[in-house]
Amino acid sequence: MLLKVRRASLKPPATPHQGAFRAGNVIGQLIYLLTWSLFTAWLRPPTLLQGPRTSPQGSPPRSPWGDCAEPSCLCEMKIRRRRHEGPAWGQSGFLAGGLHLVPSSLSLAACGVVRMKGLWGRGAGIRGR
């Protein structure tokens, strides 16, 4: 009587959260956060980037928007607050929560509506002609 000895494979068993789907989510997240931070930094007036300055009277300078806080800072604070709410902050909940704050071109790329496979997949050169 022969018993087959099954050797343990070198690769661990694939779990559903590993693989291309998860990696795509992370890359999409990073692109989204990078573009959003660049976008908000571009909106900021230069005085805020240089640091808080006080006027000769001692009161802080007024922002061009009046008494209210700066919109892009508020948006970033909202996004950061949402990001720490749940364990799956990088998944659809985070993106759906922050999408109404961003321009449509950024949100389309963040949602993955622009599919990379269709643009740069195998055979795209032949199909594109």
From Swiss-Prot:
Keywords per UniProt: Membrane, Transmembrane, Transmembrane helix
Q: What is this protein called?
A: Transmembrane protein 105
Transmembrane residue ranges: 23-43, 94-114
Q: How does it sit in the membrane?
A: Multi-pass membrane protein
Origin: domain of life: Eukaryota
Task: Name the encoding gene, please.
Answer: TMEM105
Keyword RNA-binding carried by entry: no
Q: Name one GO cellular component term.
A: membrane
Q: Where in the cell is it found?
A: Membrane
Q: List the disulfide bonds.
A: none
